[in-house]
Each structure stands twice: as C-alpha cells, then as structure tokens.
Amino acid sequence: MVRAAPRVGLAEVLRRHGPAYLATHALPAVKAKVWRAILACRTAALGGQEQTCETCGATRHVYRSCRNRHCPKCQTRAKEAWLAARQREVLPVPYFHLVFTLPHDLNGLIGQCPRALYEMLFGAVSATLTEFAANPRWLGGTAAFTLILHTWKQDLGRHVHLHALVPGGALKADGTWVPAKPGFLFPNEALSSVFRGKFVTALKLARQACKLQGATVLADHPWRELLRAVHRHAWVVYAKHSLGGPEQVLDYLVYRFLKVLTIRLMPDRTSSTGKPPGRDSSRERLARYVA
C-alpha cells in the first residue's frame, strides 16, 4: 500500500531548503522580511499564550501569527472575509470571465515599478469595461465587475494578468436591467484594441509625470524600443464561456483564486538524475518562488 506524501507547508520548505538557497542568493530587504515572518509564524519566536481547560486542567500553548499578507497560514480569515463580501455582491444572473494580459516585454518594467504598473492595469481594464458597457450598441448601462490580479503562472514565472468576472448585463440610468445577449458580452478584438490603447496612454503619462522612478528604460532610445516591442504583439483579451449563476461564480472564485500556496514534497522516487521523474526539486521550486 502506497501512502500519500505528507503535506508540507511553505515554512517547513524554507526551514529545510532555505539555508542552502540563502548561501548562494541574496534576498532584497522586503523579501527577507517576508521570509523571516513566514518562518516565525505560529512559533515561540512571536510569543503566545497558554490556554487551560477549566474542566480537565489540560493546557496547550497557542503561538501568535505573523499576519504577513504573503504567509499562507495567515490567509484563511482574510479569505473567508473576502468571500463573504463577494457573496453579498453577486447578482442572480449569468456571468462572464475575461482575462486581460500584459505582454512579457513589460516584465522588466513591472519588476522595477510594480505598484505603478499594477495601478495602470486596473485602471485600463476598469475604463475599458465601463466604456463598453456604457455603449448602447452593447449594453448601454453601468457595468459591474470583480477584478483579480495574478502576477505569475503555474511555473512561478512572471505573467501579469487581470481576471474579470462580469455579470451578463448592465444597469440603465432609470434603474432597469439590460441583459447581455446569450453567450456574448463584448467583441474580443475591440476589447483588446481599446485595452492596449488605454494602458499605453497611461504608461506614457506616467513617464511624463515622473511616476516610474528607478526604471531603466526612461531614456529616449530604450523607451522607444519598449513601446515598439509593446505594439508588436497583439494584446489578446481571453473570454471564457459564461460561468453561470452566483453559485458557479463563487465556486470559481474559491477554487481558482483563493488556493493557499502549499508545496508538497514528493516521496523519494528518483530518476537517474536524482530527481522525481518529471518534477523539479523543492529547492528549484523555492528558487522560482523567491525570484
């Protein structure tokens, strides 16, 4: 009988493989702070309290949490609060799922000015969806949507994209609801073109307003090269089929977007290379996580 591999949390992975990684990699101050918080979370390092049962007298030690937003152990309550808030917002109508992705040519700039670029992304997507919903050709009303930022893909490489969960309809000025056509919300090619235009405009304005401090592409020549690269690629907006009603939407939110990061350490089934077949070592996955 083969037993399932035990679940090992991120803190344990850092304890086991962190020293070897840190011996050859220097962490920026921000990442080092997160690293220390995850290791200290719910341990004696942060202190705690002793709880005693009034009936049997049994005692236990409860250690404090680090409350760092990157810590998997501390996200359960935040997840539950977020989900409860979204439950109050969901409408009893079909939903659509759209994905707005930034071209990888922007990855270097995103790494240098993440907050500014993420704000531009949210702004461009919000303005695009609002504009299309207000157009009488499509809905002619006020849009509602939930935007969720993802900054990496499954292999932990940088892949910045925004998921949009959009009700199939809009609210007119007189309070009436305008439903979208069955299985159709907005034309994808037009969405992509408008989204790119709004983002690139915001990018140029940010450079003019000196909001990209620290970026290495602000000089005229590298800036023109960046804009040419950005315009070379099609900005595809991916639209998935309708997600159905509120129950399906909430299921999607929970299982797709609120998964807590846990790394499973595989059993010692190694190939001739010393690695589990087809898998990276935990140390390699750790390197991608902190990169």
Predicted regions and their residues:
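Detector for conserved single-position "signature" residues within domains
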Residues: M1-A291
